[in-house]
């Protein structure tokens, strides 16, 4: 929920929040005060990496290499932009679990409940 708080980090849109948490393997309900140091470090790194990747790739957070690994070609790279965001009811690229859409603080958030297992990640 911290990433949803504009006083913590301003300017993160819904898609960046979903993607940062996905790449950090954190659930949006995880409390920052209860995260391990390595989880906090990873979260900090992912905020920078995912934001920069989205900027460089014109809003895409799906890495080009991961896309090529999944699909073998680049023809549809423009159509598939994210790992979790706006992919509700579609399989997770990592584990195959169905991506879920939830509402938190009046904002939509997308997550894989298997990859982002609340409170149980030991990154």
Put a short name on every predicted segment.
Residues 1-123:
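Basic, nucleic-acid-binding surfaces and adjacent catalytic neighborhoods in DNA/RNA-processing proteins
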């Amino acid at each position: 929920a911290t990433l949803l708080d504009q006083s913590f980090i301003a300017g993160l849109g819904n898609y960046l929040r979903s993607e940062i948490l996905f790449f950090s393997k954190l659930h949006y309900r995880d409390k920052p005060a209860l995260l391990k140091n390595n989880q906090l470090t990873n979260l900090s790194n992912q905020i920078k990496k995912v934001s920069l990747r989205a900027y460089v790739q014109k809003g895409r957070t799906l890495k080009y290499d991961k896309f090529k690994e999944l699909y073998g070609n680049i023809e549809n790279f423009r159509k598939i932009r994210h790992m979790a965001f706006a992919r509700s009811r579609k399989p997770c690229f990592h584990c195959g679990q169905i991506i879920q859409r939830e509402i938190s603080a009046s904002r939509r958030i997308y997550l894989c409940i298997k990859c982002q297992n609340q409170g149980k990640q030991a990154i």
